[in-house]
Amino acid sequence: MSKIVAVVVLAAFCVAMLVSDVSAKTSISVKGESNVDVVSQINSLVSSIVSGANVSAVLLAQTLVNILQILIDANVFA
């Protein structure tokens, strides 16, 4: 089930990037942490899906939050 959710999240991100003018921002500042490289998070998520491993719910949630933060920063929902 988590693999399906992960694929849907990644597909939604790809569609949002194609439809809107999202900048090439690939890292965001997370409170209490250094910059998070969202591209490496997505690569890790895709690798987990392709290898057939269970997708960590924490990784999925963090990736989704970071993708949403980039989309919000780019005013996609405005």
Swiss-Prot record:
<dbReference type="GO" id="GO:0005576">
    <property type="term" value="C:extracellular region"/>
</dbReference>
<feature type="signal peptide">
    <location>
        <begin position="1"/>
        <end position="24"/>
    </location>
</feature>
<keyword id="KW-0325">Glycoprotein</keyword>
<feature type="glycosylation site" description="N-linked (GlcNAc...) asparagine">
    <location>
        <position position="54"/>
    </location>
</feature>
<keyword id="KW-0732">Signal</keyword>
<comment type="subunit">
    <text>Occurs as monomer and a variety of oligomers. Component of the apisin heterooctamer complex consisting of 4 copies of MRJP1 and 4 copies of apisimin, associated with 8 molecules of 24-methylenecholesterol; apisimin forms a bridge connecting two MRJP1 dimers. At low pH multiple apisin octamers stack to form filaments that increase the viscosity of royal jelly; these filaments may be stabilized by bound fatty acid chains. The mandibular gland, where royal jelly is produced, has low pH conditions favouring filament formation, while the higher pH of the insect midgut favors filament disassembly.</text>
</comment>
<protein>
    <recommendedName>
        <fullName>Apisimin</fullName>
    </recommendedName>
</protein>
<comment type="function">
    <text>Major component of royal jelly, a substance produced in the hypopharyngeal gland containing proteins, free amino acids, fatty acids, sugars and other nutrients, which is fed to developing larvae by worker nurse bees. All larvae are fed some royal jelly early in their development but it forms the principal source of nutrition for larvae destined to become queen bees. May play an important role in honey bee nutrition. However, its role could not only be associated with larval development, because high level of mRNA is found in both forager and nurse honey bees.</text>
</comment>
<dbReference type="GO" id="GO:0032934">
    <property type="term" value="F:sterol binding"/>
</dbReference>
<dbReference type="GO" id="GO:0022609">
    <property type="term" value="P:multicellular organism adhesion to substrate"/>
</dbReference>
<keyword id="KW-0964">Secreted</keyword>
